[in-house]
Amino acid sequence: MAGPEPNPFYPLPHCTMPSRLFHRLAVTLFFIAASALGISARAQFGPKPANPGGSTVTTPHVQAELVAHAPQGVGPGQPLWLGLQITHQPDWHTYWKNPGDSGLPTELTWQLPAGLDAGDIAWPVPHKIAIGTLANYGYEGTVLLPVPVTVAQTFAPGPLAKDVTVQLKASWLVCRKECIPEEGHFTLQLPIQSTTALHSAAFDAAQKAQPQPLAKASVQQQAQVDGDALQVRVAGLPAALRGKTLDLFPEMPEVLHNAAPGTQQWEGDVWTARIPLAEQRSNSPSTLPVVLAERVQGSTPRPGYRADLTVQGPWPAVAAKASVSPALEAALKANAALAGSWLPPAAPSGASSLTLTAALLGALLGGL
């Protein structure tokens, strides 16, 4: 397999901007790349696919597959799960619902038959991924993003129907030191009367990776704004966690300083922590949902626990909107100039190259 094309552009930092600003850039890049240059991923044929596309998309950075779990077939009241299973190449990662300091969460858009209703992604516990002075939340290795599907009592595929067709458009940002927006179109046919359980082990593991809810917020499950930090108290965690160091993942972005170590300790069965607020904070919630999990090395799966923290005390004023640093602005302008005299070769199926991303960033610079 041929190696990556050499990059003639000035190197750009790994998403070194607040996620609010990055979101604007990345979404714009995504649509420019997908519509103008035709570099979206092509679906490869999986088991019993239906046009247009198959159940698997492969890029140089990930393999993404639309999978299903319907142990009793597809019918009213029967359990039905769909999911996108992403297998990352080594050192590459995609993002959680709150991507952290930079990045974008994976997005799923479903096209389902009448009577089937897809819920939200049941996000597994993420891992903290350090990139220089930043901290992101996401996944490496293989992860399944499961989605519960409700089958209505009115579901009526017809007396001669044997299968239902599920279609999915997914978009994800995959990063190493560089970030590449990718998308895929997936199609899968599910038998109505027969069992679909080929990926039952993966769905069982994904179920165990879901954060378990703690008791409703109380005086022992709260957060207190204290100057430029948040004092957190959480009771009701399993006894097996007592005395151990925990990771806290806020579900809401741009509230806490993701890369700051903070301080934490146990007071009997109550876990307490002091976590600095984000320098570019843009949210001031009265309730902050968080996920807690034991701190481990690498991407080892571990159970997580979800709490809705009642936030007390006045929030400081939110930070002014961030601007692009002079160094990044200079690099973007230089890359835009180079892009005018260099046309990249066709990218591999499914991937937009960093050189293309740099050129588009330069073109967008005037709109920041």
What feature does the model see in each segment?
Residues 2-5:
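Acidic, Ala/Val/Gly-enriched low-complexity intrinsically disordered segments
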Residues 9-29:
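Bacterial N-terminal signal peptides that target proteins for export
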Residues 26-38:
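Bacterial N-terminal signal peptides
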Residues 32, 71, 135, 356, ...:
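N-terminal hydrophobic or amphipathic segments with adjacent small-residue motifs
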Residues 41-352:
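Extracellular/lumen-exposed scaffold segments
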Residues 346-368:
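Core alpha-helical transmembrane segments of integral membrane proteins
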